[in-house]
Regions:
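Start-transfer (signal-anchor) and selected internal transmembrane alpha helices
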Residues: 1-37, 166-218, 514, 525-526, ...
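Membrane-interface transmembrane helices that cradle and orient dolichyl/undecaprenyl
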Residues: 355-375
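Membrane-interface alpha helices of multi-pass inner-membrane proteins
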Residues: 375-390, 425-430
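Perimembrane helix-loop-helix junctions
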Residues: 396-429, 508-517
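Membrane-interface helix-loop junctions at the exits of transmembrane helices
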Residues: 29-36, 212-223, 242-252, 285, ...
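Periplasmic/ER-lumenal interhelical loops and adjacent helix-loop junctions
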Residues: 420, 427-511, 630-650
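Active-site-proximal, structured, solvent-exposed surfaces of multi-pass membrane proteins
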Residues: 195-197, 651-774
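Active-site lumenal/periplasmic loops and adjacent helix-entry segments of GT-C-fold
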Residues: 213-351, 358, 385, 392, ...
């Protein structure tokens, strides 16, 4: 294909050259726009007005206390004019409450979506806000308002609004992305005119676009689907953005999480695909836009990868398309993505078809075929992707991989097969070493909440049998069906588009109508049906998880980590998608074109009455969640707090909270992310300690800024970073997080392995292509 495109000599076409010139002009304009966006607007407290507070000449600001009562708009500043751009709003204040007061900006002459702002809560010990506003049209009548909560005191001292070049960065990014898209469409149209693209391929392309569009329907409303895990994952996105801004790559500890104490979520929970959303947020997009684009990209990746894998397995593009549709629009995937906001499992869904396809090749292809030696590629990408996206799904997949290898044990020990499987393990581990080494290091070295939940039972969180075979699902909130029944239940099933093909396949076997299937497809169908059925059974309330859990200490840890048995539906979904493909092949081989049309029409109808029905309920019965900037949701939410050092009282983690022994004096204190600079001296006769507003994780170091002398760092009260200051010491201390050398070495190994494997596969492909041409 690439040679045919070269033969078209696009560079000689006048229209294409004009298109490139236009794109170049836009690129130049975008680059120029990056400069000169650094205006700063200052407003002192004299320009503000207050309906209840008194002005303090001594502290140069408006002072409010409990005698004022709770007042909305207690302090105001109007008449703010800002040109189009993205700004950081810094209100300088003092308060003794936590999230009791609020600062916001509003447009007094509002126009739809021309001014985006959520504001920020005010915190004791912080002293300045840091929220963003998006001014998408020149504004002349903006206002700042400060709401007083009625408790404690509040002193409002001044305002600073700093412009950034974020809009220009967004424009440049959109120009680059738009240019690539337009050029691709142009080449496609010209290719069609020159060579005439096969109608079947056009149908497939249109079908894939439609599936992506339908999978993204909930994104086509104003707002995000509010759900249990959404805030947690939005915090992860914000953490990646903050880490990138502060030069931390890859992200290990989110610097702003937990009131600036930091949270090591990224060490335990892979962020690989989530870096897409983090990069978009860092680029300047609002949090909601970054979320939407990320979900759209994940939907696209799921559709395309599933299509590639299933059409390769079943050797038919239409079967691949319909399997991709059934898998992407499966009830469990849609519910997890939109109802639960489970980004980790949504990312895991991207890679599962690669693992299924990889094992299909390993156990069905001719081992003498030259291509057999490359069967490790989809398996390696799939397993590495799972490990770096969602370890729990990796745990489930590992269990079923063991079962599959036991079932196929004779083939496993063939020399070439064993080599392929060994390569999969080795390359998956090496390419994931950058994530696995810190993870294992902390699990062995530390003591975290996640290591102390082995007694948590999961069986009572199982699903009812009726849920597995339900047809119509509604968006609900109830996830505990053992005593609440199915009233207001969350969608926890596989959907009729997956269980009906299973019923048909069982009927084919029962009535011995298997002539329409090859022995290979029949065996694949049997294994997929068995594994899918087993996975469904493991989600039920009746499955004896409690007995299994307490068999040993290992089973305790593994079972409790699952949290919800319905996680096995992710395995059931991909297995039953394979069954659906087998049934389609049977129908096509039995009835020809009529069988294909019947299957396509039937699958579309089933998806409409199940998944699209669920999406409709989600869109119309859930209020939109508009979050432009993460500052408005605070930084303290950590879901179950699994990655906190065990025993930490998160409610005591307050901004700027310093504790130090008697005899120690501190001056010139400053904190940026995970780095603290301070000048101190110890006048005492003994070594003293300073407890800093950083949560203790292995990797923090403290040293003298001049001599480089290292100070002892240890876990202090409430698991915060504590530094030992020797008696008589006087100087400047620098404290910060630093990845150990072996973490960095693991990162280098992963990069080299991925690059090496990529180059090796590319060279091998080129050699094969050269051989075919010769």
């Amino acid at each position: 294909m690439w040679q045919k495109i070269k033969d078209m000599h696009m560079e000689k076409k006048r229209s294409f050259r004009m298109l490139l010139i236009m794109e170049l002009c836009l690129l130049v304009a975008g680059v120029i726009g990056l400069f000169g966006k650094d205006d700063v607007y200052y407003f002192d407290s004299h320009e503000m007005v207050s309906s209840v507070g008194g002005y303090s000449q001594e502290k140069e600001g408006y002072f409010l206390d409990e005698s004022c009562g709770a007042v909305s708009g207690a302090v105001k500043l109007g008449g703010i004019s800002l040109p189009r751009g993205v700004y950081t709003v810094s209100l300088y204040y003092e308060t003794d409450t936590f999230m009791g007061n609020m600062c916001n900006m509003t447009d007094l002459a509002p126009q739809y979506k021309t001014f985006l702002c959520n504001g920020e809560h005010l915190y004791e010990g912080l002293g300045v806000t840091d929220f963003q506003v998006w001014v998408l049209k020149d504004k002349e009548n903006l206002a700042l308002t400060v709401d007083y909560g009625g408790t404690g005191y509040l002193l409002v001292q001044g305002l600073e609004i700093a412009q950034s070049n974020a809009l220009s960065r967004i424009f440049l990014f959109c120009v680059i992305l738009g240019a690539l898209s337009v050029n691709a469409c142009y080449v496609y149209v010209m290719y069609d005119k020159t060579y005439v693209i096969d109608r079947k391929d056009k149908n497939i392309l249109a079908g894939l676009v439609l599936v992506i569009a339908f999978a993204s329907l909930p994104l086509m409303v104003d707002g995000m689907q509010s759900n249990a895990d959404l805030v947690f994952h939005l915090m992860r996105v914000a953490g990646i953005k903050d880490g990138l801004q502060m030069g931390q790559f890859p992200l290990r500890i989110a610097p702003e999480w937990q009131q600036g104490y930091g949270y090591a979520c990224s060490i335990f929970y892979g962020d690989t695909l989530l870096y897409i959303a983090g990069f978009l947020r860092w680029l300047g997009f609002s949090l909601i836009t970054s979320y939407r684009l990320f979900v759209l990209i994940v939907n696209g990746m799921t559709v395309l990868i599933a299509y590639y894998c299933f059409q390769k397995m079943f050797r038919d593009k239409y079967v691949g398309l319909m399997c991709s549709a059934v898998y992407t629009l499966s009830i469990y995937r849609v519910a997890k993505l939109y109802v639960n906001g489970a980004f980790g499992e949504a990312c895991a869904n991207v890679f599962l078809p690669l693992i299924v396809y990889g094992f299909y090749r390993v156990f069905t292809e001719d081992i003498e075929d030259k291509k057999y030696g490359r069967a490790w590629i989809p398996l390696t990408i799939g397993f590495a992707g799972l490990v770096q996206s969602h370890l729990l799904t990796g745990e489930l997949t590992g269990l079923f991989t063991i079962l599959l290898c036991l079932a196929m044990w004779k083939k496993v020990f063939r020399a070439r097969t064993f080599t392929v499987l060994a390569k999969t393990v080795i390359y998956s581990v090496l390419s994931s070493l950058w994530f696995l080494v810190p993870f294992v290091d902390y699990m062995l070295r530390g003591d975290f909440v996640i290591q102390n939940v082995a007694e948590r039972e999961i069986q009572y969180r199982g699903v009812q049998l009726a849920q597995l075979f339900s047809v119509f699902f509604n968006r609900g909130n109830n996830v505990f069906y053992y005593n609440n029944g199915l009233s207001d239940a969350q969608p926890s099933g596989i959907g009729i588009a997956l269980w009906l093909p299973l019923v048909v396949f069982v009927g084919i076997l029962y009535f011995r109508k298997t002539k329409g299937l090859s022995s290979k497809d029949l065996k694949v169908g049997k294994i997929a049906a068995a594994f899918g059925g087993l996975a469904m059974c493991m989600t039920l309330l009746a499955f004896p998880w409690d007995k299994i859990q307490f068999l040993s200490s290992i089973s305790k840890t593994l079972v409790s980590s699952l949290q919800f048995p319905n996680r096995f539906l992710i395995i059931a979904s991909v297995c039953l998608t394979v069954v659906c493909g087998v049934v389609m092949k049977w129908a096509m081989n039995t009835w020809g074109q009529k069988g294909l049309v019947t299957c396509v029409a039937g699958i579309v109808a089933l998806l409409l009455v199940s998944t699209v029905y669920l999406m409709n309920d989600m869109v119309y019965n859930n209020s939109g969640y508009l979050v432009y900037d993460e500052e408005c949701i605070g930084s303290g939410y950590v879901a179950g707090g699994e990655y906190l050092p065990y025993g930490t009282d998160a409610s005591q983690l307050m901004y700027g909270k310093l504790n130090y022994d008697e005899g120690i004096e501190i001056a010139d204190y400053s904190k940026t992310g995970l780095n603290i600079d301070l000048t101190c001296r110890n006048l005492g006769q003994q070594d003293g300690r300073i407890e800093l507003p950083l949560l203790y994780y292995w990797g923090y170091k403290a040293q003298d800024a001049v001599t480089g002398e290292e100070m002892q760092v240890f876990k202090g009260t409430n698991n915060v970073v504590s530094v030992v200051v020797p008696s008589g010491y006087e100087g400047q201390l620098k404290v910060g997080f630093e990845s150990p050398w072996y973490w960095r070495m693991a990162e280098l190994v992963s990069v080299l392995v991925v690059l090496g494997l990529g180059v090796s596969v590319y060279i091998q492909k080129r050699k094969e292509m050269s051989g075919h041409e010769a």
